[in-house]
């Protein structure tokens, strides 16, 4: 090969190597340090949290509950409403119809001082199950976590100009995902029509199953080349536009929670990256992060009738909730930067 061609080939190779290195850094570099080592016992005061999480999952996800099973879906919705009302919240309904069934999103708010339209920090979880599934992990775990966050955060005072919204969505699962009947898309569209600004959104999606067994964790390409093979962590996933929020969220979680965590930035075309309610907010250009145990990439009972309340690890779920409580407090005390 001629010297000129060698130089060109080396230059091209150097550019490719630099591009790959940058892409890996962009996707995987996260603030803080991942917790390693044994978990400390939960405190005495945290036992109530653990018991509440179990009770919530049993109440909302002991049977298939979706538009195809409207009575069960209604029971889950009423439990959520009753629990929030019992905590002293005024529960707002966003009602619409799906195949002749009246369904609803449920929302509670805490608003900081100041005039004008507050910027929004939205924490959400869907409460419907997939067809043919009980839905304890997907997504009774997310609903239980959000109900407990409502309890833990009921006295929070958002900063001036900020409003915290806790939202329970219907119709996240197929066949409604990414359609006009998807609950979170209905919610996000309503905010856009009202000219509201979402500065941060967290989607709590399937967060209750963990394993210490080597090989228990799988990933879509290219994450399988970059992340650990043991499913003992909680994951935080964002699209490139939400990278700044992801760093803020996982940095806060790692400061406050002695629990393993991993973060990833991925294109929405990568399998699984957009598989939850954060997708609805991405559609409007708002920063949003999915919090997940990675669902089908770890959980053997995903979308089956075996996804029952007895399968979940409530001790570890409680630790995740405590970490998320601190994350949300950090988000609503000061305005998140986009």
Regions found by a protein language model. Name each.
Residues 130-241, 273:
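Acidic/histidine-rich catalytic neighborhood of metal-dependent amide-processing enzymes
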Residues 49-57, 72, 76, 80, ...:
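Stable alpha-helical elements in mature extracytoplasmic
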Residues 200, 210-338:
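Active-site-adjacent substrate-binding region
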Residues 67, 90, 97-99, 114, ...:
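Solvent-exposed loop/turn segments at secondary-structure junctions
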Residues 10-28:
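Hydrophobic membrane-insertion alpha-helices, especially the h-region
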Residues 44, 56-113, 262-264:
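A non-catalytic alpha/beta surface segment that caps or lines the substrate-entry region
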Residues 107, 121-124, 165-168, 199-205, ...:
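Structural recognition of the beta-strand scaffold that forms the well-ordered cores
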Residues 25-72, 128, 298-307:
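N-terminal capping segment at the start of a domain
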